[in-house]
Regions:
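Conserved ATP-binding/catalytic motifs of P-loop helicase motor domains
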Residues: 1-184
Protein backbone atom coordinates (compact mmCIF):
# COMPACT_ATOMS: atom_id res chain seq x y z
CA UNK A 1 0.00 0.00 0.00
CA UNK A 2 1.11 3.55 -0.62
CA UNK A 3 1.35 5.78 2.48
CA UNK A 4 -1.87 7.53 1.44
CA UNK A 5 -3.73 4.23 0.96
CA UNK A 6 -2.38 2.94 4.27
CA UNK A 7 -3.73 6.04 6.02
CA UNK A 8 -7.11 5.44 4.37
CA UNK A 9 -7.14 1.79 5.49
CA UNK A 10 -6.40 2.82 9.07
CA UNK A 11 -9.03 5.57 9.06
CA UNK A 12 -11.77 3.34 7.63
CA UNK A 13 -10.84 0.47 9.99
CA UNK A 14 -11.10 2.81 12.99
CA UNK A 15 -14.48 4.08 11.73
CA UNK A 16 -15.76 0.50 11.30
CA UNK A 17 -14.81 -0.36 14.90
CA UNK A 18 -16.45 2.77 16.34
CA UNK A 19 -20.03 1.66 16.96
CA UNK A 20 -21.02 5.13 18.19
CA UNK A 21 -19.33 6.97 15.31
CA UNK A 22 -20.90 8.37 12.17
CA UNK A 23 -22.92 6.07 9.94
CA UNK A 24 -21.17 7.22 6.76
CA UNK A 25 -17.49 7.34 5.79
CA UNK A 26 -16.68 9.26 2.62
CA UNK A 27 -13.63 7.80 0.85
CA UNK A 28 -13.15 9.98 -2.19
CA UNK A 29 -10.43 10.09 -4.78
CA UNK A 30 -9.64 10.57 -8.41
CA UNK A 31 -9.90 7.72 -10.88
CA UNK A 32 -7.03 5.30 -10.43
CA UNK A 33 -6.30 6.06 -6.77
CA UNK A 34 -7.41 2.62 -5.55
CA UNK A 35 -10.76 3.30 -3.87
CA UNK A 36 -12.32 0.02 -5.04
CA UNK A 37 -9.18 -1.97 -4.23
CA UNK A 38 -9.19 -0.57 -0.70
CA UNK A 39 -12.90 -1.35 -0.28
CA UNK A 40 -12.39 -4.98 -1.33
CA UNK A 41 -9.49 -5.30 1.13
CA UNK A 42 -11.48 -3.74 3.99
CA UNK A 43 -14.47 -5.99 3.28
CA UNK A 44 -12.39 -9.10 3.95
CA UNK A 45 -12.54 -8.36 7.68
CA UNK A 46 -16.29 -7.68 7.78
CA UNK A 47 -18.76 -10.54 8.16
CA UNK A 48 -21.60 -9.38 5.91
CA UNK A 49 -20.80 -6.76 3.26
CA UNK A 50 -23.09 -5.60 0.47
CA UNK A 51 -21.65 -3.79 -2.54
CA UNK A 52 -23.79 -1.53 -4.72
CA UNK A 53 -23.69 1.32 -7.21
CA UNK A 54 -26.23 3.63 -8.79
CA UNK A 55 -26.09 2.01 -12.23
CA UNK A 56 -25.92 -1.58 -13.39
CA UNK A 57 -22.79 -0.79 -15.40
CA UNK A 58 -21.02 0.59 -12.31
CA UNK A 59 -22.09 -2.52 -10.35
CA UNK A 60 -20.61 -4.70 -13.11
CA UNK A 61 -17.32 -2.80 -12.89
CA UNK A 62 -17.37 -3.34 -9.10
CA UNK A 63 -17.84 -7.10 -9.59
CA UNK A 64 -14.93 -7.17 -12.04
CA UNK A 65 -12.79 -5.48 -9.38
CA UNK A 66 -13.63 -8.11 -6.78
CA UNK A 67 -16.70 -6.64 -5.09
CA UNK A 68 -18.65 -9.88 -4.80
CA UNK A 69 -22.36 -9.66 -5.51
CA UNK A 70 -22.30 -5.95 -6.39
CA UNK A 71 -25.70 -4.80 -7.59
CA UNK A 72 -27.62 -1.59 -8.10
CA UNK A 73 -28.64 0.33 -4.99
CA UNK A 74 -32.25 0.07 -6.14
CA UNK A 75 -32.16 -3.73 -6.37
CA UNK A 76 -30.49 -3.87 -2.95
CA UNK A 77 -33.04 -1.82 -1.00
CA UNK A 78 -36.31 -1.71 -2.97
CA UNK A 79 -38.90 -4.23 -4.06
CA UNK A 80 -41.39 -4.03 -6.93
CA UNK A 81 -44.95 -3.86 -5.63
CA UNK A 82 -46.95 -3.14 -8.76
CA UNK A 83 -47.01 -1.72 -12.22
CA UNK A 84 -49.39 1.10 -12.93
CA UNK A 85 -49.87 2.28 -16.50
CA UNK A 86 -46.82 0.27 -17.51
CA UNK A 87 -44.64 2.05 -14.95
CA UNK A 88 -43.09 -0.05 -12.18
CA UNK A 89 -43.66 1.06 -8.58
CA UNK A 90 -41.01 0.28 -6.01
CA UNK A 91 -41.07 0.55 -2.22
CA UNK A 92 -38.36 0.31 0.38
CA UNK A 93 -37.91 -3.34 1.36
CA UNK A 94 -37.44 -3.52 5.14
CA UNK A 95 -36.39 -7.15 4.74
CA UNK A 96 -33.82 -6.47 2.04
CA UNK A 97 -30.31 -7.94 2.37
CA UNK A 98 -29.20 -4.43 3.40
CA UNK A 99 -31.04 -4.85 6.71
CA UNK A 100 -28.73 -7.71 7.76
CA UNK A 101 -25.49 -6.19 6.45
CA UNK A 102 -22.65 -5.11 8.70
CA UNK A 103 -21.36 -2.76 5.99
CA UNK A 104 -22.68 -1.39 2.72
CA UNK A 105 -20.15 -0.12 0.17
CA UNK A 106 -21.50 2.27 -2.46
CA UNK A 107 -19.44 3.31 -5.49
CA UNK A 108 -20.05 6.23 -7.86
CA UNK A 109 -21.95 8.11 -5.13
CA UNK A 110 -22.19 11.40 -7.02
CA UNK A 111 -25.31 9.96 -8.68
CA UNK A 112 -27.16 9.33 -5.40
CA UNK A 113 -29.90 11.87 -4.67
CA UNK A 114 -31.38 12.77 -1.29
CA UNK A 115 -34.31 10.32 -1.34
CA UNK A 116 -32.14 7.36 -2.33
CA UNK A 117 -29.48 8.36 0.20
CA UNK A 118 -31.99 8.66 3.05
CA UNK A 119 -33.58 5.33 2.12
CA UNK A 120 -30.15 3.70 2.15
CA UNK A 121 -29.32 5.16 5.57
CA UNK A 122 -32.70 4.10 6.98
CA UNK A 123 -31.33 0.58 7.52
CA UNK A 124 -28.98 1.91 10.22
CA UNK A 125 -25.99 0.09 8.70
CA UNK A 126 -22.54 1.64 8.30
CA UNK A 127 -22.09 2.89 4.74
CA UNK A 128 -18.72 3.38 3.06
CA UNK A 129 -19.22 5.66 0.07
CA UNK A 130 -16.68 5.85 -2.74
CA UNK A 131 -16.57 8.62 -5.28
CA UNK A 132 -14.69 11.21 -7.25
CA UNK A 133 -15.67 14.76 -6.22
CA UNK A 134 -14.35 16.03 -9.55
CA UNK A 135 -16.67 13.82 -11.58
CA UNK A 136 -19.20 15.79 -13.58
CA UNK A 137 -22.45 15.87 -11.62
CA UNK A 138 -25.71 14.62 -13.10
CA UNK A 139 -28.09 17.18 -14.56
CA UNK A 140 -30.25 17.30 -11.44
CA UNK A 141 -31.01 15.81 -8.07
CA UNK A 142 -27.86 14.06 -6.92
CA UNK A 143 -24.95 14.76 -4.61
CA UNK A 144 -26.44 13.57 -1.32
CA UNK A 145 -23.16 12.00 -0.20
CA UNK A 146 -20.83 14.39 -2.06
CA UNK A 147 -22.31 17.56 -0.54
CA UNK A 148 -20.10 17.08 2.54
CA UNK A 149 -16.32 17.06 2.68
CA UNK A 150 -14.64 13.65 2.32
CA UNK A 151 -13.35 11.87 5.40
CA UNK A 152 -10.38 10.81 3.27
CA UNK A 153 -9.32 12.08 -0.13
CA UNK A 154 -6.99 9.96 -2.28
CA UNK A 155 -4.97 11.93 -4.82
CA UNK A 156 -2.11 9.62 -5.77
CA UNK A 157 -2.64 7.83 -9.10
CA UNK A 158 -1.16 4.32 -9.10
CA UNK A 159 0.93 2.56 -11.71
CA UNK A 160 -1.93 0.49 -13.15
CA UNK A 161 -3.91 3.66 -13.91
CA UNK A 162 -1.10 6.15 -14.55
CA UNK A 163 -0.68 5.07 -18.19
CA UNK A 164 -4.39 5.34 -18.96
CA UNK A 165 -4.78 8.20 -21.47
CA UNK A 166 -8.15 9.28 -20.08
CA UNK A 167 -6.74 9.55 -16.56
CA UNK A 168 -3.65 11.34 -17.89
CA UNK A 169 -5.78 13.92 -19.72
CA UNK A 170 -8.14 14.42 -16.78
CA UNK A 171 -5.17 15.02 -14.48
CA UNK A 172 -3.77 17.55 -16.95
CA UNK A 173 -7.05 19.50 -16.94
CA UNK A 174 -7.48 19.15 -13.15
CA UNK A 175 -4.04 20.73 -12.68
CA UNK A 176 -4.98 23.73 -14.84
CA UNK A 177 -3.41 22.55 -18.08
CA UNK A 178 -4.91 22.71 -21.52
CA UNK A 179 -5.49 19.86 -23.91
CA UNK A 180 -3.66 20.10 -27.18
CA UNK A 181 -5.56 19.48 -30.37
CA UNK A 182 -5.08 16.01 -31.67
CA UNK A 183 -6.29 12.45 -31.58
CA UNK A 184 -6.38 10.68 -28.28
Amino acid sequence: WSPQQDSALKAVSAWLKDRDGPQVFRLFGWAGTGKSTLAVHLAQDVRNVKFAAFTGKAALVMRKRGCKGAQTIHSLIYTLVSEKDGEPRFVLDDESPAADADLIVIDEVSMVDEQLGRDLLSFGVKVLVLGDPFQLPPVQGAGFFTADEPDMMLTEIHRQAADNPIIHLSMQVREGGFLERGRY
